């Protein structure tokens, strides 16, 4: 009996807010979007165990490491909205867009060695058949802390806590709408590609086909690299564009450099 009493006292001393915070936030989801310079974290979505009052939530209630919170609001679905709902189980935390990155000087060690060899031979630009200089795709996640108090629809307060919560899953907006496929020719050679099909596809209709071919900087063995490295492909599959111009979007993913600066090309281009 004494043991139970002592344990209860210890838990009370630790603070009710810390326990309720961990208990009442049931899930943290990271959401990415693709910008001109690549895929980045844009939103964090919190799922609570009770309806949260919309007027009890503000951007100052949440903190994301190394990012600025643009706005925070309540929704009744796990997605962004133009307006906050009066109540909902989801708190949407939108982040300020990061400044554009200059990736022109990014170089993998192997590619730096290749570049030196080319310079010694007086050759500039990508080497035909080379592997390019693409970095491995980053697994984007999110961390978030609730630093303010939010209120449930029945008046219960969920207090602030310094606990840092990690995302359990990541949504890749627009990227997730592409399917990954591989083409195999009669000689057994393969080419990876990503394909977007209009959401309201009607086999009785004809649709335009947009083809996006990445440059040597995105040469990679990772199937979705061309979708993540910049918005050259995803821009055409965005809801805004598709609403006006329904179309298929095809984005091949080359594993080697297919054309060099002398306009010489390899068999992959065929």
Name every feature range the model reports, one short phrase each:
Residues 209, 213-269:
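Active-site machinery of serine-nucleophile hydrolases
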Residues 40-57:
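A short glycine/threonine-centered beta-strand motif
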Residues 9-18:
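Bacterial N-terminal signal peptides
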Residues 22-45, 66-207:
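A domain-start/cap signature at the N-terminus of enzymes
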Residues 3, 182-185, 197-199, 215-217, ...:
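Short, flexible loop/turn elements at secondary-structure junctions
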Residues 50, 97, 253-256:
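A mature extracytoplasmic/lumenal domain signature
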Residues 1-10:
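Bacterial N-terminal signal peptides that target proteins for export
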């Amino acid at each position: 009996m004494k043991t139970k009493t002592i344990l209860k006292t210890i838990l009370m001393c630790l603070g009710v807010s810390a326990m309720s915070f961990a208990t009442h936030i049931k899930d943290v989801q990271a959401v990415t979007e693709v910008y001109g310079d690549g895929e980045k974290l844009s939103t964090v979505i919190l799922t609570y165990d009770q309806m949260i009052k919309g007027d009890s939530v503000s951007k100052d209630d949440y903190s994301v490491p190394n990012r600025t919170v643009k706005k925070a609001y309540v929704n009744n679905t796990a997605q962004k909205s133009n307006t906050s709902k009066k109540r909902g189980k989801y708190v949407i935390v939108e982040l300020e867009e990061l400044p554009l990155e200059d990736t022109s000087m990014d170089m993998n060690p192997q590619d730096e060695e290749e570049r030196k060899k080319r310079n010694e031979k007086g050759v500039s630009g990508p080497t035909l058949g080379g592997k390019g200089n693409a970095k491995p795709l980053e697994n984007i996640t999110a961390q978030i802390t609730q630093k303010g108090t939010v209120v449930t629809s029945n008046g219960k307060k969920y207090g602030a806590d310094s606990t840092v919560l990690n995302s359990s899953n990541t949504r890749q907006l627009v990227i997730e709408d592409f399917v990954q496929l591989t083409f195999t020719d009669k000689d057994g050679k393969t080419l990876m590609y990503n394909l977007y099909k209009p959401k309201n596809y009607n086999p009785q209709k004809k649709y335009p086909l947009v083809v996006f071919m990445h440059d040597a900087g995105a040469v990679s063995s990772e199937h979705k690299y061309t979708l993540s490295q910049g918005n050259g492909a995803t821009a055409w599959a965005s809801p805004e564009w598709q609403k006006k111009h329904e179309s298929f979007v095809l984005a091949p993913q080359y594993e080697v450099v297919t054309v060099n600066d002398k306009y010489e090309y390899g068999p992959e281009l065929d």
